[in-house]
Amino acid sequence: MKFFIDTASLDEIKAANELGVLDGVTTNPSLIAKIVKDPANFTYADFKAHIKKICDIVDGPVSAEVTTLKAEEMIAQGEELAAIHENVVIKCPLTVEGLKAIKHFSSNGIKTNATLVFSPTQALLAAKAGADFVSPFVGRLDDISTNGMELVKQIVTIYDNYGYLTEVIVASVRNPLHVVESAMVGADIATIPYSVIKQLANHPLTDKGLEKFMEDAGVMKP
């Protein structure tokens, strides 16, 4: 299973990369907005420069999302983003217009990530249009009392049934259990906030054991 980090923070990306477990990065407009210190003067050129910095840190796919709703505009914007670095993946919303853009990109060798996926039919359409990745949002489904992980299971089954090569990125991950369940149902990737990545390494019994080991190590003579 691959681990992506879901953030636009360069510091978080660097920290996660140092752990040796990072395979890629996903960003979106909301995550970009969190790291902008001067929104009034933040330009599209600044956005592209930031994506380039991320690509310089991580040797893996970096998803950058289009910020328009019409297919023609998504295509123009996506082609501009794809030119930043060979690892850039264009995130398109799973809408009718988004599908048109995904088909265009897949036909022209530009990698895509179908995002904001909340149903198996959306995921099926994404695969048929040639998306390289599909991102079901489990946490947001859980928020409305729907089983988000059940959707992931359905998508994995459908893709396996028909041999689709689209990789499933479990998104909107809220806790370590989401990661465990993603691995158990066979998802290809989980894209995880840095706070949750750190939680994956923690266990109270590990802390307790270390405390005892350090205490016992103190009796050793130099």
Swiss-Prot record:
Function (record text): Transaldolase is important for the balance of metabolites in the pentose-phosphate pathway.
Reaction(s) the record says it catalyses: D-sedoheptulose 7-phosphate + D-glyceraldehyde 3-phosphate = D-erythrose 4-phosphate + beta-D-fructose 6-phosphate
Cystine pairs: none
Organism for this UniProt entry: Chlorobaculum parvum (strain DSM 263 / NCIMB 8327)
Residues the record marks as active site: K91 (schiff-base intermediate with substrate)
Gene Ontology biological process terms in this record: carbohydrate metabolic process; pentose-phosphate shunt
CDD domains: Transaldolase_FSA
Keywords, sorted A to Z: Cytoplasm, Pentose shunt, Schiff base, Transferase
Protein name: Probable transaldolase
Enzyme superclass (EC): transferase
Pathway annotation from the record: Carbohydrate degradation; pentose phosphate pathway; D-glyceraldehyde 3-phosphate and beta-D-fructose 6-phosphate from D-ribose 5-phosphate and D-xylulose 5-phosphate (non-oxidative stage): step 2/3
EC number: 2.2.1.2
Subcellular compartments: Cytoplasm
Coiled-coil annotated spans: none
Gene Ontology CC annotations of this record: cytoplasm
Family to which the UniProt record says this protein belongs: Belongs to the transaldolase family. Type 3B subfamily.
Designated gene of the protein: tal
UniProt cross-references to SUPFAM superfamilies, sorted A to Z: Aldolase (SSF51569)
GO molecular function terms listed in the Swiss-Prot or TrEMBL record: aldehyde-lyase activity; transaldolase activity
